[in-house]
């Protein structure tokens, strides 16, 4: 599975909606960069089981974004902040601070 590192932003936004196990799997694979085998072996699972579980978490994050659109809204606010940075730097900086960028 090719790693889509943009998922880490979705994880930052929606990780609290995942179960502990889902967060652990996501972190192991995407943040700590462990292979499917490295995750599977200590747990006595197959690579395929771990692949399916990681894919499920990935799909869940995309589902949350499709419904809640927090990343989309953050991206729009960031673009707005960038566009007004020349006119009103204080407001631009405040928007960036609010969205955490």
Where are these regions (language model features)?
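Residues within the DNA-recognition helix of helix-turn-helix
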Residues: 53-56
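Short amphipathic alpha helix immediately N-terminal
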Residues: 20-32
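Short, Lys/Arg-enriched N-terminal segment that forms or immediately precedes the first helix
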Residues: 2-15
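Helix-turn-helix/homeodomain-like alpha-helical modules used for DNA recognition
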Residues: 80-101
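C-terminal flanking helix
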Residues: 58-65
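Hydrophobic positions on the alpha-helical face of helix-turn-helix-like DNA-binding modules
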Residues: 39-40, 50
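Helix-turn-helix DNA-binding elements, focusing on the entry/boundary residues of the two helices
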Residues: 35-37, 43
């Amino acid at each position: 599975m090719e790693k889509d590192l943009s998922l880490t932003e979705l994880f930052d936004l929606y990780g609290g909606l995942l179960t502990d196990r889902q967060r652990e799997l996501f972190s192991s694979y995407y943040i700590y960069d462990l292979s499917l085998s490295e995750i599977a072996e200590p747990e006595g699972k197959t690579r395929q089981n771990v692949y399916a579980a990681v894919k499920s978490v990935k799909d869940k994050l995309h589902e949350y974004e499709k419904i809640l659109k927090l990343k989309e809204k953050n991206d729009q606010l960031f673009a707005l902040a960038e566009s007004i940075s020349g006119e009103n730097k204080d407001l631009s900086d405040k928007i960036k601070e609010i969205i955490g960028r």
